[in-house]
């Protein structure tokens, strides 16, 4: 595998931009008969796979950290909502069932924070297998926990959890996109098991 630098305006290059679920932008890139000179080659021919794998591991470690930040923000706004929203004359946070759900969200976030820290520490490893194993484990675990925290936050806010006026729905959408970026939870579980089998 080799990497090439291609001008987006070169003949044969077409882009189709579209909005992502979280409001960001992405594009499909189509290459049809694109011709490149030797100067477009980045690095040495055939040596790009380790560079790509390392870059993807760095991107995944960064997404782990972003997801934990969003999970923490969801915990904060949800706790505040439970303290202020009243039902039957008392804050809904007084109901034990909702306290348990909030506690589950906090536990999931703190465990995810530990996994994100593991990914951040190991992403600089010179051992590619160790790096990939740690990052894949973190992505798989955080993907599942982010889904739990996001869904609980939306549910605990009731109908307010999906209105544009609150950040809860926006945070949930971002967690959903993070969960699918560079592979979903099942993909990262597969990567993790592959690194164990190869060891």
Annotate each predicted stretch with a short phrase.
Residues 1-76, 80, 90, 199:
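FAD-binding core of flavoproteins
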Residues 54-199:
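Alpha-helical interface subdomain recognition
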């Amino acid at each position: 595998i080799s990497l090439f630098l291609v001008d987006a305006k070169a003949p044969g290059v077409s882009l189709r931009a579209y909005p992502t679920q979280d409001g960001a932008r992405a594009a499909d890139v189509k290459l049809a008969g694109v011709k490149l000179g030797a100067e477009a080659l980045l690095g040495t021919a055939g040596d790009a796979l380790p560079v790509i794998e390392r870059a993807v591991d760095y991107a995944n470690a960064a997404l782990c950290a972003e997801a934990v930040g969003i999970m923490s923000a969801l915990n904060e706004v949800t706790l505040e909502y439970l303290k202020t929203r009243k039902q039957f004359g008392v804050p809904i946070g007084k109901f034990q069932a909702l306290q348990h759900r909030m506690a589950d969200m906090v536990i999931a976030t703190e465990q995810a924070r530990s996994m994100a820290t593991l990914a951040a520490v190991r992403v600089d490893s010179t051992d590619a297998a160790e790096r990939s194993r740690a990052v894949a484990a973190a992505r798989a675990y955080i993907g599942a926990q982010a889904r739990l925290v996001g869904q609980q936050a939306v549910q605990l806010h009731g109908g307010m959890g999906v209105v544009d006026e609150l950040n809860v729905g926006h945070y949930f959408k971002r967690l959903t996109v993070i969960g699918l970026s560079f592979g979903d939870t099942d993909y990262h579980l597969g990567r993790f098991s592959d690194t164990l089998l190869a060891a």
